């Protein structure tokens, strides 16, 4: 159950917050005017967002300058407030009547260098080195998952592409997730329940009594049974062609709670050693209904990583679960592993990962809404070659 907050029986929890504008505490200035505060913590390059609505019935609210930096803390009175980071104001709205000012701020300033188109090429380097270089030129601190940092990148071009879009492309190709949080450029493995530095994120347990609304949806996993990726390079001048199939190594079963009752086990066979072909196709999953990646990769290794990343993403999307917590939890973040209980068996038996957190706070309440996806553990693969 949600035990992060302990309080005396019969006592009333009161929402609390602190808001700073460019290092100046302005909480007292807006406390009587605050209508609502919504804070969205998102995965990936969808920036975290802060929306503040202020009552301007008397017309005395000053409009903040775009580019101003807001630092926000939220929680409950009597408990330590949790810092949710710094946000750059990039939208200001005024509407009426009655008159209301809406301030919208984001964790990354997308009017700045991250969104500027660039030209460049990278040769004989690593994924970690590329991320660190991009972080440096955008005045951010890089934090890259160790399992991703050492991936070799023989060559890649950034052509009329913003750093944000280029990093997203790198993440999709290599099974990563990229985001900007509190001045850090994070490049981590999605859905693994670990931080960018590799530390395990403590698991949270949620019971049905903790929430007042929930939604569960499961999709037909057979919609796509596999992913293929093609490669073409010039290491071998002979025009050999090779098709490689990706198989999970036999170990603990994944998605066990979501498996179709008529599913049959697949016999694994050992992959023979063959020289890498100049041209080929790589498949993750089964061949019945395949999702084909349109990019032609430079090497077999790049094609394998791209196919594995897409296949894992499809697997994580097998089911979706969302819940609204009646008592707000400022200490919960995206990528946190979750176990639930009190729902249907298929929901309770599955491990989950938080993909989006939305905090809503006003003078009368504080709630937290969570969106979750199926959690995949650190999956290992082996290959079969079809000549």
Model-derived features with residue positions:
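Conserved "cap/hinge" positions at secondary-structure junctions
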Residues: 74-76, 189, 342
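Short, compositionally biased
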Residues: 86-95, 120, 192-194, 351-363
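Glycine-rich, acidic and aromatic/proline-enriched surface loops and short helix-turn segments
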Residues: 95-98, 126-143, 298-305
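Polar, S/T/G-rich
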Residues: 125-136, 160-172, 224, 228-232
């Amino acid at each position: 159950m949600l035990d992060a907050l302990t309080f005396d029986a019969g006592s009333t929890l009161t929402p609390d917050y602190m808001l700073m504008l460019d290092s100046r505490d302005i909480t007292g200035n807006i406390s009587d005017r605050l209508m609502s505060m919504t804070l969205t913590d998102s995965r990936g390059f969808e920036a975290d967002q802060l929306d503040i609505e202020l009552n301007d019935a008397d017309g005395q609210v000053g409009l903040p300058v775009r580019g101003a930096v807001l630092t926000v803390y939220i929680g409950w009175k009597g408990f330590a407030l949790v810092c949710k980071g710094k946000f750059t104001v990039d939208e200001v709205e005024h509407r009426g009547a009655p008159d209301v000012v809406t301030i919208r701020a984001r964790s990354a300033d997308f009017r700045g260098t991250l969104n500027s188109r660039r030209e460049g090429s990278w040769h004989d380097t690593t994924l970690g080195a590329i991320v660190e270089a991009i972080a440096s030129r955008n005045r951010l601190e890089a934090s890259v998952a160790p399992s991703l940092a050492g991936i070799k990148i023989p060559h890649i071009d950034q052509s009329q592409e913003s750093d944000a879009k280029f990093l997203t492309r790198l993440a999709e190709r290599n099974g990563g997730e990229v985001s900007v949080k509190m001045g850090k450029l994070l490049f981590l493995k999605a859905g693994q329940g670990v931080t960018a530095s590799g530390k395990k994120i403590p698991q949270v347990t949620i019971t049905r009594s903790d929430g007042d609304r929930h939604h569960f949806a499961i999709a037909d996993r057979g919609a796509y049974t596999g992913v293929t990726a093609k490669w073409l390079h010039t290491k071998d001048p002979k025009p050999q062609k090779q098709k490689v199939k990706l198989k999970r190594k036999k170990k603990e079963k994944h998605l066990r709670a979501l498996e179709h009752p008529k599913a049959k086990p697949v016999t694994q066979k050992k992959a023979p050693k063959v020289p890498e072909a100049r041209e080929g196709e790589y498949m993750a999953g089964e061949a019945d209904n395949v999702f084909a990646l349109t990019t032609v990769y430079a090497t077999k290794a790049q094609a394998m990583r791209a196919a594995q990343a897409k296949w894992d993403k499809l697997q994580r999307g097998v089911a979706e679960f969302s819940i609204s917590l009646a008592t707000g939890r400022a200490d919960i973040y995206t990528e946190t592993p979750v176990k639930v209980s009190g729902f249907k068996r298929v929901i309770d038996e599955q491990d989950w990962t938080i993909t989006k957190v939305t905090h809503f706070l006003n003078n009368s309440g504080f709630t937290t809404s969570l969106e979750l996806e199926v959690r995949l553990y650190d999956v290992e693969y082996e290959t079969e070659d079809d000549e």
